[in-house]
């Protein structure tokens, strides 16, 4: 591989990982300007609409707990494909939700599946980079993760000048579809000989151990 091709590949990789990192904050904050107008259309209360944020946050937390162990066992590519495909579907569910109950379901699934990409993006970074390069790559991903929540409401507000909140979720579905294509083209970065056994079962045992540890809970 020539230096030019290596640089090009590295740029493509960084863009892909950055997009994976951005999907969760974008899905969280892009529709925030629409919160005041959503209760009337869905015939519900403002507090129920605000629950869509909390439900997604719970999904994100759950997905981050198990996304990493799954990718360590199965590799990076298959969980990425599955997560992004389900994120497309969940975004469509949100876009066409006829009721608050369906919207809450879609938001939970959106958080659960979108967070898988965020976790795996960091794992892929560790697969490809080491030392100072890894530090720089993590810094870039953290910058994207920090900028997305700031920019997303501004973009969402501008979109609402021309369209409805449902289109915002359609845009998120398109964004996830682009990530799905990227996942299909992505070359597996974790060889079979480097994968671990146990996966979710081992992770669950570790989480239970931490929950039972009074010293750990005392520091949280």
Summary of predicted features, one role per range:
Residues 12-46:
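Extracytoplasmic
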Residues 90-95, 106, 110, 126, ...:
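MFS-fold secondary transporters
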Residues 98, 102, 139-184:
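Helix-loop-helix hairpin linking two adjacent transmembrane segments in secondary transporters
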Residues 106-147:
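Cytoplasmic helix-loop-helix junction between adjacent transmembrane helices
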Residues 184-208:
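Flexible cytoplasmic inter-helical loops of multi-pass small-molecule transporters
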């Amino acid at each position: 591989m020539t230096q030019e091709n290596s640089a090009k590949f590295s740029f493509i990789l960084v863009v892909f990982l950055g997009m994976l990192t951005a999907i969760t904050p974008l899905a969280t904050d892009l529709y925030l300007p629409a919160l005041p107008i959503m209760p009337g259309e869905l015939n519900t209360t403002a507090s129920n609409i605000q629950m869509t944020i909390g439900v997604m946050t719970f999904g994100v937390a759950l997905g981050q707990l198990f996304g990493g162990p799954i990718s360590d066992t199965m590799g990076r590519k298959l969980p990425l494909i599955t997560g992004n495909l389900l994120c497309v579907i969940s975004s469509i569910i949100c876009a066409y939700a006829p009721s608050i109950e369906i919207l809450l379901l879609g938001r939970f699934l959106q958080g659960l599946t979108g967070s898988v990409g965020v976790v795996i993006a960091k794992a892929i970074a560790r697969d490809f980079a080491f030392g100072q390069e890894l530090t720089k790559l993590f810094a870039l991903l953290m910058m994207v993760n920090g900028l997305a929540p700031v920019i997303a409401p501004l973009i969402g507000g501008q979109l609402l000048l021309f369209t409805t909140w449902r289109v915002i979720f359609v845009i998120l579905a398109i964004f996830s579809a682009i990530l799905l294509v990227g996942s299909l083209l992505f070359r597996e970065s974790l060889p079979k000989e480097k994968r671990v056994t146990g996966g979710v079962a081992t992770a669950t045992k570790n989480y239970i151990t931490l929950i039972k540890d009074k010293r750990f809970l005392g520091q949280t």
